[in-house]
A protein has these predicted regions:
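Proline-aspartate-enriched helix->loop->beta-strand connector
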Residues: 95-107, 280, 284-290, 295
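Short, solvent-exposed loop/turn elements at domain surfaces
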Residues: 64-70, 201-202, 319-321
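Extended active-site neighborhood of metal-dependent phosphoesterases/phosphodiesterases
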Residues: 26-46, 76-77, 81, 115-228, ...
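N-terminal active-site segment of His-dependent metallophosphoesterases
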Residues: 1-125, 130, 136
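Structural motif
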Residues: 54-56, 105, 189-191, 226-228, ...
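Binuclear metal-dependent phosphoesterase catalytic core
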Residues: 2-45, 180, 184, 257-267, ...
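Short active-site segment of divalent metal-dependent hydrolases/proteases
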Residues: 64, 113-114, 156, 235, ...
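Active-site glycine-centered loops adjacent to acidic/histidine catalytic or metal-binding residues
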Residues: 61, 110-111, 153-154, 232, ...
């Protein structure tokens, strides 16, 4: 009997070790890799692999839990436990699943705190401290090898009807995370970050007009350099559009709500069709990256300049309605493409999945309790 007990104890200990540690190493050891490593050698044109791409890790929708998440009393034990387990999961995922890939860039696509727009300054700063700890921002800021870029989401500044009336929320966000509309270059690829929450707002508001002025200024210097459009809210698609094989939940159709008095946006899950068409025509991206939906989705838009792929990256949190949290690895070319190559050859992506925390609890921790 004691042999069976010892055997079961060893099996349980190994299962616990796998669920709490080794499972988070699987993406870097086995299931995921930088997409440029699989590109045809003919594209390399004699350039060394190690220096010919900028490596970008894309993360979205951590939505750190707070008093707005589960309607639990602030500082209650239940809320503290929920925060602890979600924070621990994301920190393990970041340190053990994402950082081992040694990315040059960390790109966040928005929604950092669940109740970001309505938290008090004290609560917001507390969430900011947790965010910095989870994603080890102090270490990243001290490293000369990793740069971090941020995109704002609706859980950061609210939708247009909110942030146009609460400019202090936007200022608070910008103080720590930086500008909402900006551009940057990685290798030979331009990235255009747009504040999607303001795109469909009242055109008379300063915050919406500022976003569109930025987009139009960007459109004035379009050249042959490939562009990636970054938008927290996904672009428009017709209802029931397939999201591809990585989707784990039903597709959500277009939903939009406007204020009666000024038609400002109260809620939306996609950018409107009009704004989508204008963005694609003015910016002319070869790729769009988005978040917001919490689940994975890949679709193709047809613009007047050709087909454009959009990847909606799933949430990195296990508590945001997606059993299969994910992140994305993106390789941006850092050399001149051979003649005859398309702009799409400059960018490649690979979706990577994180451990299913619920399965770990069921298979490892529940037997422990028994």
């Amino acid at each position: 009997m004691w042999k069976i007990t010892v055997f079961l104890s060893i099996v349980w200990a190994l299962s616990l070790l796998y669920g709490e540690w080794f499972a988070f190493l699987m993406p870097s050891l086995w299931s995921c890799s930088w997409p440029h490593l699989h590109r045809q050698s003919s594209l390399m044109n004699g350039v060394d692999y190690s220096s010919s791409y900028v490596k970008v890790a894309v993360i979205t929708d951590p939505q750190l839990m707070d008093r707005t998440s589960l309607h639990l009393p602030p500082k209650s034990l239940a809320l503290e436990l929920a925060q602890f387990y979600t924070d621990v999961y994301m920190r393990r995922a970041f340190l053990s699943s994402i950082l081992p890939f040694n990315p040059d860039i960390i790109l966040f696509l928005g929604d950092y705190f669940d109740g970001g727009p309505i938290l008090s300054d004290e609560e917001w700063q507390e969430s900011w401290g947790r965010f910095r700890h989870i994603f080890d921002l102090n270490m990243l800021q001290q490293s000369a090898n990793v740069k971090v870029y941020y995109l704002d989401g609706n859980h950061d500044i609210g939708y247009a009807a909110f942030n146009s009336r609460k400019p202090e929320v936007t200022r608070r966000y910008e103080k720590e995370f930086g500008a909402r509309n900006y551009r940057f270059t990685l290798g030979r690829v331009n990235f255009i970050a747009v504040d999607a929450q303001t795109l469909d707002g009242n055109l008379q508001s300063n915050i919406t007009s500022a976003t569109w002025n930025f987009v139009r200024n960007v459109s004035k210097d379009v050249d042959s350099t490939p562009r990636v459009l970054l938008t927290h809210i996904p672009l428009y698609r017709t209802d029931s559009t397939s999201c591809g094989p990585h989707r784990s939940s039903p597709v959500i159709n277009q939903r939009i709500s406007r204020a009666a008095h000024d038609q400002d946006i109260l809620y939306q899950n996609y950018v409107t069709e009009k704004s989508t068409d204008e963005l694609l025509d003015l910016i002319r991206p070869v790729l769009v990256l988005s978040g917001h939906d919490h689940d994975q989705c890949t679709i193709t838009h047809m613009s007047k300049y050709g087909a454009v792929s959009e990847h909606t990256v799933g949430t990195v949190s296990w508590q945001q309605g997606n059993l299969y949290p994910s992140f994305m690895l993106l390789s941006a070319i850092n050399f001149t493409l051979p003649e005859g190559s398309s702009a799409e050859d400059a960018i490649s992506t690979h979706l990577c999945f994180l451990p299913v925390q619920l399965f770990i609890y069921i298979c490892v921790h529940f037997p422990e309790a028994w």
